[in-house]
Amino acid sequence: MHYAETIAESHLTPAEQAKREGLKARKPYVAQKLANIAAMEERGEISPIIRLEKSYLCNFQCTHCSAEYYMDRHKKKVFKIEDTRSKIDLDFVRKLSKEADDLGLARFVITGGEPLVMKDFDDVVAALDPEKHYIITDTNGWFLDDARAKHLKDIGVEKVQLSLDSMIEKDHDNFRNKPGSYKRVLRAVDASLDAGLNLLLSTVLVKGRVKTQEFIDMCEYATKKGVGLYVSYAKPTGSCSDHPEFVIDKEDADILRDLEKEYNVFTHMTPTYGSYKGCITVKGIITVTSTGEVTPCPYIDMSLGNLRETNLKEVLARGMRNPWLGPYRPDCLIGEDQQFIKFHTKKTKGFTHLPVPWGQGFSDENNTLTDGVEA
């Protein structure tokens, strides 16, 4: 994902600077941690956003869902089994918040699943502690009306990331398998802005879509609303593993890079305010699953360890030691590196309880780029 908060303040626009000043007045500790990130990176330290998947409950069944294979409904349908692994609780979330704070980490994204169906959503926000961390939530927008948006702001959520997959109503609803979802998303956009929440629109790019007028219309809509449009490439994981025709090609990526010059549209690979970090595995993002496993990317289904057994500092160190994940790389590992995709597919195919545990996928033993990959 694209998070402007990671960049030095000297590169901010006036509007972004005003947002920073507002945060500084309301939450000085959080604002200072965000301001420290650039210096951390200059020292060679990492400050990944932490995606927290406490629950995979969802009211949608999206065609492109990267989390579908983690959901109980998928395991029951495909494997005829239930996931009996114990799930993380609020005490786990509080401990994670403290470990992250001790490392100077500043940002959490509550995701899933659909976070706003979680009965304990407010408790999760409180456990993360909005006075210590910048709290973001993903949502499909179905439940995000004026009252809910104001409530999110009141409990300490700073930013909402809304999923919008087409400016053509029937296409969006079909992609989401939810009639009426398009109208709900547009309602949620206005509700979020009216409540004073920071807002990011998120959309999945499938092959050929970037060449359509619909995609240009979405870029223009986001620009008109004054919000960024984050573009996620369809990747060969989750539900998309059944749709290889969704995966974009180089021509699509090149066209998108040209559009970035004209609109406020970006990917996780986009240079931000003069800073280019390349692939953000571990360095820029990690995911904590509902069973406490840590993956280096939302689309990589192999664990770096379980936080019930290993502390966050060591899990991050494992990731940075791994030759796939730690070094700078200009390409998207799971989206473009065919050797890694082959390795990932071999390790994850048919695995019933993702992610693949530490030692069975990633390990300190597979410490070269060819380990575990057949010729």
Describe each region flagged by the PLM.
Residues 2-13, 18-36, 41, 46, ...:
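Flexible mid-to-C-terminal extensions adjoining Fe-S/redox cofactors in radical SAM and related proteins
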Residues 50, 282-284:
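Short loop/turn microsegments at loop-to-beta-strand junctions
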Residues 52, 56-59, 273, 291, ...:
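Processing junctions and N-termini across compartments
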Residues 72, 117, 145, 169, ...:
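Generic structural signal for helix capping and beta-alpha/helix-loop junctions
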Residues 2-158:
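Conserved alpha-helical substructure of the radical SAM core
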Residues 1-9, 155, 159, 163-165, ...:
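Radical SAM enzyme [4Fe-4S]-AdoMet core and its adjacent flexible, acidic
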Residues 58, 62-65, 279, 297, ...:
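Short cysteine clusters
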